[in-house]
Swiss-Prot record:
Keywords: Acetylation, Calvin cycle, Carbon dioxide fixation, Chloroplast, Disulfide bond, Lyase, Magnesium, Metal-binding, Methylation, Monooxygenase, Oxidoreductase, Photorespiration, Photosynthesis, Plastid. Substrate binds at N122, T172, K176, R294, H326, S378. One of its GO terms (molecular function) is ribulose-bisphosphate carboxylase activity. Binds 1 Mg(2+) ion per subunit. NCBIfam families: PRK04208.1 (NF003252). It comes from Dichapetalum crassifolium. Belongs to the RuBisCO large chain family. Type I subfamily. This is Ribulose bisphosphate carboxylase large chain. The keyword Aminoacyl-tRNA synthetase does not apply. One of its GO terms (cellular component) is chloroplast. Its cofactor is Mg(2+). The active site is at K174 (proton acceptor), H293 (proton acceptor).
């Protein structure tokens, strides 16, 4: 036996399965301002006490399933995560909210990738847990300040576009796949000249055989410049720079900048947080706005007892960097409860958000002037939803109508005109003190 092993044995070092509860469940722990706090919805397996399940969640901070001899080379008390509080979920059998505190030193500065790898990278497969959901995170000020955040933010975007006092209008070009680059550009032009502020590549428009990315970028740039000349307004098209490699993604963003367009787009979940943060840094350095699409989010956030809700993904996007993010509609075809949606909309836009469990916000969050993100309402909405959308999302938003623009029987430009007229009527009515909730349909009829 080596001297090191002999020493460990003499002080009680024993191999075997570790009892998580003894190490990671510390109900007397007082959280620090520098801790990252997490609220997990825990569903233990039958026979597993909630304290053990909560402690197992915290194990991802430093642990493994057994005691190892290298534990003696560091301070477990300094670095371990701690499950410091557990409470039952009202109205749900065998579900608990477990609160876990992680010391800040566990995380690399400015890395959403590392944060998620540490907190949720492994624990969701533990046998002791039937299901696990990360409900919310409290990001401490000390960690927030290590992130650049959105490339520009809400106010800078409005200044770039010279558009104030109303929501912005967008449209996703349809059909999303199958058009040639020239026909695609024609659809963009018709929408922009009709009064929209933005048009958009759909999330899976990258560089397919029928429409290579460079051709699409060129025809879309031609369309927006022509629409700008005709309308006197600044226009944009979300050119999707998402690609198979980070190098190719940046190459596409560079070409967009050379064309002089104002905004590019990234599928930040399928592309990954490392790629997204890299693109966000490029966009800030080169004056491009960044539209982030949440493709794949429902794989992660739709289940009520497993995965993580969109509020966590929204916080991560604000840290990683994006000037826009899709946020559901409340009234459209995609799932989204009003209060929960407004909860993460506030997390995207506001500088300081108070704890409010009724809206799914488990912790007070201080963003310390990190730029805000504009929420994008998109998915199954049309002109008759305009009063509700204007009331729900307010001015600092993008209201994005795909089929609600392109489906107009007279064509794309009349569809865009209808949306612009409806929006301006709703904003004027709101400013005059009219109730959009009760008078919305009447306001739209008057405008038509």
């Amino acid at each position: 036996m080596s001297p090191q092993t002999e020493t460990k044995a003499s002080v009680g070092f024993k191999a075997g399965v570790k009892e998580y509860k003894l190490t990671y469940y510390t109900p007397d722990y007082e959280t620090k301002d520098t801790d990252i706090l997490a609220a997990f919805r825990v569903t233990p397996q039958p026979g597993v006490p909630p304290e053990k399940a909560g402690a197992a969640v915290a194990e991802s901070s430093t642990g493994t399933w057994t005691t190892v001899w290298t534990d003696g080379f560091t301070s477990l008390d300094r670095y371990k995560g701690r499950c410091y509080h557990i409470e039952p979920v009202a109205g749900e059998e065998n579900q608990y909210i477990a609160y876990v505190a992680y010391p800040l030193d566990l995380f690399e500065e400015g890395s959403v990738t590392n944060m998620f790898t540490s907190i949720v990278g492994n624990v969701f497969g533990f046998k002791a847990l039937r299901a696990l959901r990360l409900e919310d995170l409290r990001i401490p000020v000390a960690y927030v300040k290590t992130f650049q955040g959105p490339p520009h933010g809400i106010q800078v975007e409005r200044d770039k576009l010279n558009k104030y006092g109303r929501p912005l209008l967008g449209c996703t070009i349809k059909p999303k796949l199958g058009l040639s680059a020239k026909n695609y550009g024609r659809a963009v032009y018709e929408c922009l000249r009709g009064g929209l502020d933005f048009t958009k590549d759909d999330e899976n428009v990258n560089s397919q055989p029928f429409m290579r990315w460079r051709d699409r970028f060129c025809f879309c740039a031609e369309a927006l410049y022509k629409a700008q000349a005709e309308t006197g307004e600044i226009k944009g098209h979300y050119l999707n720079a998402t690609a198979g490699t980070c190098e190719e993604m940046i190459k596409r963003a560079v070409f967009a900048r050379e064309l002089g367009v104002p905004i590019v787009m990234h599928d930040y979940l399928t592309g990954g947080f490392t790629a997204n943060t890299s693109l966000a840094h490029y966009c800030r350095d080169n004056g491009l706005l960044l539209h982030x699409h949440r493709a794949m989010h429902a794989v992660i956030d739709r289940q009520k007892n497993h995965g993580m809700p969109f509020r966590v993904l929204a916080k991560a996007l604000r840290m990683s960097g994006g000037d826009h993010i899709h946020a559901g509609t409340v009234v459209g075809k995609l799932e989204g409860e009003r209060e929960i949606t407004l909860g993460f909309v506030d997390l995207l836009r506001d500088d300081f958000i108070e704890k409010d469990r009724s809206r799914g916000i488990y912790f007070t969050q201080d963003w310390v002037s990190l730029p805000g993100v504009i929420p994008v309402a998109s998915g199954g909405i049309h002109v008759w939803h305009m009063p509700a959308l204007t009331e729900i999302f307010g001015d600092d938003s993008v209201l994005q109508f795909g089929g609600g623009t392109l489906g107009h029987p007279w064509g794309n430009a009349p569809g865009a005109v209808a949306n612009r007229v409806a929006l301006e009527a709703c904003v004027q009515a709101r400013n005059e003190g009219r109730d959009l909730a009760s008078e919305g349909n009447e306001i739209i009829r008057e405008a038509s």
